Amino acid sequence: MVITKGVTALLVSFFVALGGGRVLIPWLLKLKIGQTVRTEGPKRHLKKSGTPTMGGIIFLLSLVVTVVVFQAFDAKTLLLLITTLLFGLLGFLDDYLKVVLRRPLGLRAREKLLGQVIFSLVLTFGAVAFLGRGTDWYIPFSRLLLGEPRYLELGNVFFFAATIFIMVGFANAVNLTDGVDGLCSSVTLIVMSFFAMTSLALKEKGLFIFALALMGGLVGFLVYNRHPAKVFMGDTGSLALGAAVAGFAVLTQTELFLLLVGLIYVVETLSVIIQVIVYQLTGKRVFKMSPLHHHFELSGWSENKIVLVFSLVTLIMVLISGYGL
């Protein structure tokens, strides 16, 4: 019954996103809300200049509609939905400043960081104070290897600090991954399948509906976002997806699994950090360009090949992680 309801939610969300895209994309084109492509990026990206952005609205709308239709109003689901939408709103403001008000850098870095920290606190405090979330992390594979689940106790201070770091870190990591047509949406679609599986195992019906609804919305969005993309998700979508991924982990005590299922996000972020540090110290670059997907682009990989390989890596990590629950 729960699985049937979840699959139905996925289909509803898919069709809402499909219809939403048909309405939103022409409207964005009419308003000339198009992405400005950086000249220092891969040269073949220059032809994408003017492609509508803020497309994250498509799958966020389908998510909200589906959650309401299926009345997934339990406290955990609502807290995750609110946090996801708050991050999406922050991304929307950033996109709006960039493409509508023509402020190239959008929100200032400190403004964006402050908003992310505050919204992360909303989820963290809500989970601990109102949902009875403990300050421990489930240790992956402990049930499989030791016969019983084991947890790593962090204590209040470290738990809050670590959770905020995870929320902010993954919001920005997912944002970094959004640099190739269909990449971020494809990888996150597969990551969400892990959290759907986790929610089902924990009998969290609301979170299960949320995960399937977001998956359906992403499939619908991919119809327009696959190469060659007719729309980009923008920070509106990528920050929201990052918050959803990290928020799911916090609410299901699976934070450590993010290193596995979110491997692509982690590697993309590390490639940027390594590139900056090595260049500042030696004046040389480790990668042709960072994040990592741009390195592969400049190495001759097509966008479709990058999406396929990164998605397969994510799928493998999700399958492995399933045994660790």
From Swiss-Prot:
The protein's required cofactors: Mg(2+)
Pfam family, one: MraY_sig1
Chief subcellular location: membrane
GO cellular component: plasma membrane
Known pathway: Cell wall biogenesis; peptidoglycan biosynthesis
Entry's Gene Ontology BP terms: cell division; cell wall organization; peptidoglycan biosynthetic process; regulation of cell shape
Top class in the EC scheme: transferase
Parts of the chain that traverse the membrane: 9-29, 53-73, 77-97, 112-132, 154-174, 182-202, 204-224, 231-251, 257-277, 305-325
Location relative to the cell: Cell membrane
Its membrane topology: Multi-pass membrane protein
MF (Gene Ontology): metal ion binding; phospho-N-acetylmuramoyl-pentapeptide-transferase activity; UDP-N-acetylmuramoyl-L-alanyl-D-glutamyl-meso-2,6-diaminopimelyl-D-alanyl-D-alanine:undecaprenyl-phosphate transferase activity
Record NCBIfam families: mraY (TIGR00445)
PANTHER family found in the cross-reference section: PHOSPHO-N-ACETYLMURAMOYL-PENTAPEPTIDE-TRANSFERASE, PHOSPHO-N-ACETYLMURAMOYL-PENTAPEPTIDE-TRANSFERASE HOMOLOG
Function comment: Catalyzes the initial step of the lipid cycle reactions in the biosynthesis of the cell wall peptidoglycan: transfers peptidoglycan precursor phospho-MurNAc-pentapeptide from UDP-MurNAc-pentapeptide onto the lipid carrier undecaprenyl phosphate, yielding undecaprenyl-pyrophosphoryl-MurNAc-pentapeptide, known as lipid I.
Protein's name according to its UniProt entry: Phospho-N-acetylmuramoyl-pentapeptide-transferase
Organism in which the protein naturally occurs: Carboxydothermus hydrogenoformans (strain ATCC BAA-161 / DSM 6008 / Z-2901)
